């Protein structure tokens, strides 16, 4: 064995490559071993350093891959064990144990997290060269007994199913120990680069290689100053020193110092020396030179997005200077926090990148499909799960529009559960859903699912066969191919499909002869899919590499950007959270020779120093270290390592907000510039100098010219809620000339509430989602229908009997039966409605002096050639003197207010009066009024009554009165009925004023509507709060920002309010 160390200013790779070349020139086969996370980059670096740029004598690889070179022909043809297969094996083992067999873990048998921890423990045991029987000294002895039962049973299953329990390194070590590879190894030289420690498995293999190979060469970075130190605790080279010292002591060899021809920039060397002096308690009498600072940058940004954008701009600048993507490395302090943001931002700046991390399959449509399938079976055809399965794009041959239509209907009809999905759809609504088409679609969905879900408990092999048959019926494979829209997506889908088929194969192999329920089968496949990962190799090498900062090696790239280096992530504190605590691992390590667990927490300090040292030397030209103030929406402090750099004299640059400038980094990329222009266009204006204004004026002029060529336009600002008028063509279609505009009292109210709401409802005809469940509209229809029946019954039957008959016959109507007999909630609503009818009906019984002339009367009120007002009058009454009045049933409290009417928000009663005046017989000239009847079950506070007497009854009937507009002429006739006439009497002239002003409101609205320009102007009564419909989700109206756009209502003092509003009405309607 040969141990080599060198300073950080030299290239260890060049030194080791020279050693490898010498061995190769002598005819030896050389294996150049690198850590798993670095083998790809190391291979490229080694080949670059070779004069011939390639050779068959030197193989750059990993320990695991090296073992396959020697054992590929002699290894038994057994099944391969991966994490998903291991999890299934442990699940099967736990299935065979009863809870009482496992005192410590019996309650966790079906827990997926517990199974994952078992998989991790089993892998750790293999790496540590330990068996489950070596787990002595645990906190609770019962834990070891449970683990022995579980793992031994799992290993028995592995043997039965012909799985290879040995790792590739174990098979390699066994072959060496048996002498099967002596001839090959005698002609082999092993060069090891990039390691600072070995696992127990690697350590054991290394001892065998040292005894059988021609030579083993190991290199590591250690300064000569550190190597000569006797006390190394806390030294930045502590990890490497321990590594070399342990190997030197074990193999009785002295490490040698070597140098390379390549020497890196002195700035990095001087920074390293300062860093070393800080941690070995020595002193230096010099500082960083001014030109050294050109190679280092410390950035501070407010949050992650700004930080990534600054990096992207800097990368674009490097490209402008002539460098390539492959010269740049981006390191992440927190991989999870940055992974989702860095991709879209780099795409915006058109920066190709390769993320050096396996992607989880959890977000792939295939996993979502399997999860929805499993949940559909478990939760009995829940609607959300069925729809998610369809929306994955992998079920059947359905267009998006068909799925949307199916979703709309199932939500309307409340289709959920197997019973409702299995029956034909028969309920329809005013929208007239295409039931024939929906039922055909229902059958295409239900039949294959029903065939699969009816599977009883049976052998796993049979369940897999049925699942595969189901997947063929729904054309899963064909749909999977159709998902990809780019070559990259094709490659991703191929990797996901491969993992999916591997999981099915493993399940068939492990559970093929075990009896399982379908729910267990789908749950196991779903768990395997969600935990699986895949990796896609970049199509080109000229990309920016992105990976976690703790995987970096010295001198990796010319330019390195390390971001997210907050106190919480730099240094990293690693802690185990498995089935064994660190204390238990340490006790096991004390009694085992050459076999040990890796305890990451015990090596946090020296490993973090080693990582920081590698990071500070990762670049060969320029290193940028960045820290955000806020990461994951949490404030964080500077890393202690960055504070040390500040003490060395490196300035901390506050990058600030990404304001646009005319620097190359801001305008050098069209796509990024366009996206930032749009972002600025959505923000409040910022102050600019005259030079800035001139520059951006020219840029915007150019951009608009380019956008017009592509038929694009910049969106308007969020806070300028202006609307565009409809085009002439649309106006002609919506409001054709010569045809009166159709309006109603409700439409007029909506218009004066918020013009844009009218546009949505009556021009675009947008409607809220319908539901079969009764709402206020259906409740109102029910009450109207009961009272219509009641008032039509002129028989001599007692009033109570007639009321019962009206309720009974209304309940028997098919529509109300569907609505109110669907479930217990609907039945409860019906019971409340019946109580309201019984409470309100006596009001009708008391008014014996009235006669009901008509009910549910349709009318069309002609207001000239411009407007046709339509509606339905609930009831027309006639008093004993022949005068007519209008009754409108309301399920909520309503009362006519002249101020609300003046502002256009309550035209209903006056509109009904105008319609009644038009349709009344010629011999009847007098109208006694228009009124609301609140259909309710009055609620009284009994605490306010001293005793239960006639006062209580009077209060009930007082709540059940007619409220509205009444003619002063008919005052005497109204006094005997249940009419609330106080402050509600109007003379004939005043009634005429109301009618004329009502016509003026319609004409004014119609004129504005026909112009086709609808404002976003919800009304406000006080100028401080907005009461009108704001439609925030559509208009983004914010009361505190857009109050100026709200329509201010006219309000007058209560004193003489009626007279003042009537005066205003006469003035505005030109009377």
UniProtKB/Swiss-Prot annotation:
Keywords: ATP-binding, DNA damage, DNA repair, DNA-binding, Exonuclease, Helicase, Hydrolase, Nuclease, Nucleotide-binding. Its cofactor is Mg(2+). Pfam families: ADDB_N (PF21445), PDDEXK_1 (PF12705). It is an enzyme of class 3 (hydrolase). Signal peptide: none annotated. Its EC number is 3.1.-.-. InterPro entries: ADDB_N, DNA_helicase_suRexB, P-loop_NTPase, PDDEXK-like_dom_sf, PDDEXK_AddAB-type, Restrct_endonuc-II-like. One of its GO terms (molecular function) is double-stranded DNA binding. One of its GO terms (biological process) is double-strand break repair via homologous recombination. The heterodimer acts as both an ATP-dependent DNA helicase and an ATP-dependent, dual-direction single-stranded exonuclease. Recognizes the chi site generating a DNA molecule suitable for the initiation of homologous recombination. This subunit has 5' -> 3' nuclease activity but not helicase activity. HAMAP family: AddB_type2. Despite having helicase-like domains, this subunit does not have helicase activity. Heterodimer of AddA and RexB. Belongs to the helicase family. AddB/RexB type 2 subfamily. This is ATP-dependent helicase/deoxyribonuclease subunit B. The lineage of its organism: Bacteria, Bacillati, Bacillota, Bacilli, Lactobacillales.
């Amino acid at each position: 064995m040969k141990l080599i160390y060198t300073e950080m200013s030299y290239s260890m790779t060049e030194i080791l490559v020279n050693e490898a070349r010498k061995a190769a020139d002598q005819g030896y086969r050389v294996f150049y071993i690198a850590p798993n996370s670095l083998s790809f980059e190391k291979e490229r670096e080694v080949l670059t350093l070779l004069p011939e740029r390639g050779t068959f004598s030197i193989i750059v690889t990993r320990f695991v891959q090296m073992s396959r070179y020697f054992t590929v022909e002699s290894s038994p043809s057994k099944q391969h064990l991966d994490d998903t297969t291991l999890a299934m094996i442990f699940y099967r083992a736990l299935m065979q144990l009863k809870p009482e067999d496992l005192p410590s873990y019996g309650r966790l048998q079906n827990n997926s997290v517990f199974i994952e921890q078992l998989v991790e423990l089993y892998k750790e045991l293999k790496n540590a060269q330990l068996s489950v029987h070596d787990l002595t000294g645990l906190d609770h002895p019962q834990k070891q007994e449970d683990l022995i039962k579980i793992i031994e049973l799992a290993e028995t299953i592995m043997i039965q199913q012909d799985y290879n329990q040995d790792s590739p390194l174990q098979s390699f070590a066994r072959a060496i120990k048996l002498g099967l590879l002596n001839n090959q190894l005698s002609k082999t030289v092993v060069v090891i680069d990039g390691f600072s420690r070995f696992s127990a498995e690697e350590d054991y293999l290394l001892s065998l290689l040292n005894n059988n190979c021609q030579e083993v060469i190991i290199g590591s970075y250690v300064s000569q100053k550190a190597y000569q130190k006797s006390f190394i605790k806390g030294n930045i080279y502590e990890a490497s020193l321990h590594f070399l010292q342990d190997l030197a002591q074990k193999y009785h060899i002295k490490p040698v110092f070597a140098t390379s021809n390549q020497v890196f920039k002195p700035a990095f060397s001087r920074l390293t020396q300062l860093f070393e002096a800080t941690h070995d308690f020595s002193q230096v009498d010099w500082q960083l030179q001014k030109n050294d600072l050109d190679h280092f940058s410390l950035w501070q940004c407010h949050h992650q997005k700004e930080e990534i954008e600054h990096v992207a701009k800097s990368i674009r600048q490097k490209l402008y200077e002539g460098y390539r993507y492959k010269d740049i490395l981006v390191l992440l302090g927190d991989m999870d926090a940055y992974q989702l943001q860095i991709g879209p931002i780099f795409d915006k700046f058109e920066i190709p990148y390769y993320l050096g991390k396996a992607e989880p399959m959890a977000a792939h449509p295939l996993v979502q499909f399997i999860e929805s399938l499993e949940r559909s079976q478990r939760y009995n055809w829940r609607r959300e799960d069925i729809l998610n399965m369809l929306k994955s794009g992998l079920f059947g041959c359905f267009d998006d529009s068909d799925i949307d239509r199916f979703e709309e209907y199932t939500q309307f009809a409340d289709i959920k559960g197997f019973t409702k999905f299995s029956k034909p759809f028969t309920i329809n609504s005013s929208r007239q859903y295409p039931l024939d088409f929906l039922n055909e679609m229902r059958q295409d969905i239900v039949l294959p699912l029903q065939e699969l879900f009816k599977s009883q408990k049976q052998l796993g092999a049979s369940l897999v066969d049925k699942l595969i048959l189901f997947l063929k019926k729904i054309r899963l494979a064909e749909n999977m191919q159709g998902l990809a829209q780019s070559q990259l997506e094709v490659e991703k889908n191929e990797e996901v499909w491969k993992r999916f088929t591997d999981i099915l194969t493993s399940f068939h192999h492990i559970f093929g002869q075990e009896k399982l329920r379908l729910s267990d089968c789908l749950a196991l496949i779903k768990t395997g899919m969600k935990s699986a990962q895949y990796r896609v190799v970049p199509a080109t090498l000229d990309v920016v590499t992105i990976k976690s900062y703790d995987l970096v090696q010295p001198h990796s790239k010319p330019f390195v950007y390390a971001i997210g280096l907050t106190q919480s992530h730099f240094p990293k504190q690693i802690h185990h959270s498995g089935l064994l605590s660190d204390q238990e691992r340490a006790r096991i390590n004390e009694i085992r020779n050459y076999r040990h667990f890796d305890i990451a927490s015990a090596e946090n300090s020296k490993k973090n120093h080693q990582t920081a040292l590698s990071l500070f030397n990762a670049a060969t030209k320029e290193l940028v270290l960045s820290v955000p103030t806020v990461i994951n929406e949490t404030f964080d402090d500077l890393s202690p390592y960055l504070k040390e750099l500040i003490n060395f004299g490196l300035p901390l640059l506050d990058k600030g907000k990404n304001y646009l400038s005319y620097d190359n980094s801001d305008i050098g990329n069209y796509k990024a510039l366009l996206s930032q222009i749009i972002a600025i266009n959505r923000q409040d204006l910022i102050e600019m100098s005259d030079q800035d204004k001139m520059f951006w004026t020219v840029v915007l002029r150019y951009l608009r010219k380019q956008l017009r060529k592509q038929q694009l336009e910049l969106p308007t600002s969020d806070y300028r809620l202006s609307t565009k008028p409809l085009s002439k063509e649309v106006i002609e279609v919506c409001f054709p000339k010569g045809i009166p505009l159709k309006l109603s009292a409700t439409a007029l109210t909506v218009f004066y509430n918020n013009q844009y709401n009218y546009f949505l409802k009556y021009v675009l005809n947008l409607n809220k989602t319908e539901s079969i469940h009764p709402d206020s509209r259906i409740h109102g229809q029910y009450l109207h229908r009961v009272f219509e029946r009641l008032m039509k019954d002129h028989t001599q039957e007692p009033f109570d009997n007639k009321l019962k008959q009206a309720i009974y016959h209304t309940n028997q109507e098919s529509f109300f039966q569907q609505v109110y007999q669907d479930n217990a909630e609907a039945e409860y609503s019906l019971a409340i409605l019946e109580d309201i009818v019984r409470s309100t009906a006596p009001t009708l019984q008391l008014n014996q002096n009235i006669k009901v002339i008509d009910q549910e009367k349709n009318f069309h009120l002609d207001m000239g050639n411009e407007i046709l007002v339509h509606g339905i009058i609930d009831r027309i009454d006639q008093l004993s003197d022949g005068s007519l009045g209008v009754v409108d049933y309301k399920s909520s409290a309503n009362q006519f207010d002249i101020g609300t009417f003046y502002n256009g928000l309550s035209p209903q009663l006056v509109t009904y009066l105008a319609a009644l005046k038009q349709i009344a017989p010629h011999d009847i000239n007098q109208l006694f009024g228009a009124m609301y009847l609140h259909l309710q079950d009055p609620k009284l506070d009994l605490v306010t009554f001293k005793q239960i007497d006639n006062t209580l009854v009077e209060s009930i009937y007082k709540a059940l009165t007619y409220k509205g507009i009444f003619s002063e002429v008919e005052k005497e006739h109204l006094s005997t009925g249940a009419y609330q006439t106080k402050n509600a009497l109007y003379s004939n002239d005043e009634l005429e004023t109301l009618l004329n002003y009502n016509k003026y409101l319609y004409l004014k609205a119609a004129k504005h509507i026909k112009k086709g320009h609808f404002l976003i102007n919800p009304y406000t009564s006080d100028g401080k709060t907005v009461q009108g419909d704001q439609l925030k989700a559509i208009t983004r109206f914010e009361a505190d920002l857009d109050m100026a756009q709200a329509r201010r209502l006219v309000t007058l003092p209560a004193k003489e309010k009626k007279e003042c509003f009537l005066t205003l009405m006469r003035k505005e309607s030109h009377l």
